[in-house]
């Protein structure tokens, strides 16, 4: 797949503070790439440099192999969607969507045609005459997205666009955004701190921490094979166990809990159940390993977990193939 954007040893300093040390990243044309990390990790700064709202202190940004460090945002064939929609309150949906084209002096007939298609793709046709105050948060976000895609950008940049919405609406819009990206076939670069959001929508995920890239991979690769201690603790739930000089990660769904009579492998350790949590269709057991004093998490079905009570002595263990060695 062709690389549309290249980030080559880019750094960003604010005064004497290094926000992003040398960082390199290739972004493929037509992919849904998510930059994921905690607050303050540098993900929004990276996005703003790609968009042209921040200038790299060092390094180069390339679009189609052309250097764009000094190219203004409006010449980059990119559009940015923020968490705060910045809609014009006195304009209806259609006029908000057409505003950028009007400023660019796009012919009125073409404005109408392109706005119609953008509203169709974002399911806004029936709301075209409403003003923002008469729209829900999700509908306002759709207007912001329609306003961005109506310009036919090569790349759509999204900075935590669903952060202000409630849980159900966020889930609905996650599916809509992924479907929209598939239909448009353009590159989406999406910034979020929400790992579930990243997992559900992305073709690839870039995990950032303190300005560095910790790991790049598909959602399955990031989840099943975390490379570093940070990724293992940030993505999903993991049991982190010391192994010689390093650490291994074991997902709770791979940890087995057996009665003393059912001990299967000699590697299983004696432990006792400290707590049991109901988590929907599963129960989460917290087992204190008597040998290592580690508190381990294990998932079981409600039927499997029904045999246990807090304080029960059990054996706990896992298959060696389920261990992931961490850097």
Curated annotation (Swiss-Prot):
Subcellular localization: Cell membrane
Main location: membrane
All residue ranges annotated as the ABC transporter domain in the record: 5-235
Topology in membrane: Peripheral membrane protein
EC number: 7.6.2.11
Catalytic activity: ATP + H2O + polyamine-[polyamine-binding protein]Side 1 = ADP + phosphate + polyamineSide 2 + [polyamine-binding protein]Side 1
SUPFAM superfamilies: MOP-like (SSF50331), P-loop containing nucleoside triphosphate hydrolases (SSF52540)
Key words of the record: ATP-binding, Cell membrane, Membrane, Nucleotide-binding, Translocase, Transport
Pfam families to which the protein is assigned, alphabetical: ABC_tran, TOBE_2
Gene Ontology CC terms, in alphabetical order: ATP-binding cassette (ABC) transporter complex
Family per similarity comment: Belongs to the ABC transporter superfamily. Spermidine/putrescine importer (TC 3.A.1.11.1) family.
PANTHER family documented for this protein: SPERMIDINE/PUTRESCINE IMPORT ATP-BINDING PROTEIN POTA (PTHR42781), SPERMIDINE_PUTRESCINE IMPORT ATP-BINDING PROTEIN POTA (PTHR42781:SF4)
Protein task: Part of the ABC transporter complex PotABCD involved in spermidine/putrescine import. Responsible for energy coupling to the transport system.
Protein name: Spermidine/putrescine import ATP-binding protein PotA
Organism: Bacillus thuringiensis subsp. konkukian (strain 97-27)
């Amino acid at each position: 797949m062709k690389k549309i954007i290249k980030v080559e040893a880019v750094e960003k300093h604010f005064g004497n503070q290094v926000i992003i040390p040398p960082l390199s990243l290739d972004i493929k044309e037509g992919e849904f790439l998510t930059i994921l990390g905690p607050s303050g990790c540098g993900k929004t700064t990276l996005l703003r440099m790609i968009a042209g709202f921040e200038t790299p202190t060092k390094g180069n940004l390339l679009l189609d192999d052309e250097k764009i460090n000094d190219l203004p945002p409006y010449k980059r064939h990119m559009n940015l969607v923020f968490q705060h929609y910045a809609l014009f309150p006195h304009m209806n949906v259609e006029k908000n969507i057409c505003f950028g084209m009007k400023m660019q002096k796009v012919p009125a007939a073409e404005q109408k045609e392109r706005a119609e298609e953008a509203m169709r793709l974002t399911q806004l046709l029936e709301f075209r005459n409403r003003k923002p105050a008469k729209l829900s948060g999700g509908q306002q976000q759709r207007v912001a997205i329609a306003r961005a895609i109506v310009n036919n950008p090569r790349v759509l940049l999204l900075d935590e666009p669903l952060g202000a919405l409630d849980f159900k609406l966020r889930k609905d819009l996650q599916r809509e955004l992924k479907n929209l990206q598939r239909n448009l076939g353009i590159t989406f670069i999406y910034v979020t701190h929400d790992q579930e959001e990243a997992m559900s929508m992305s073709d690839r995920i870039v995990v950032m921490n303190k300005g560095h890239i910790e790991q790049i991979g598909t959602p399955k690769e990031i989840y099943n094979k975390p490379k570093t201690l940070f990724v293992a603790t940030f993505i999903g739930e993991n049991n982190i166990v010391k192994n010689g000089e390093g650490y291994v990660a074991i997902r709770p769904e791979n940890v087995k809990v057996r009665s003393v009579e059912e001990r299967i492998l000699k590697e299983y350790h004696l432990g006792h159940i400290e707590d049991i949590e109901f988590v929907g269709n599963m129960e989460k057991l917290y087992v204190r390993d008597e040998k290592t004093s580690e508190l381990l998490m294990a998932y079981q079905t409600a039927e499997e977990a029904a045999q246990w009570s807090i304080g029960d002595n059990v054996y706990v263990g896992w298959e060696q193939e389920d261990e992931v060695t961490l850097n």
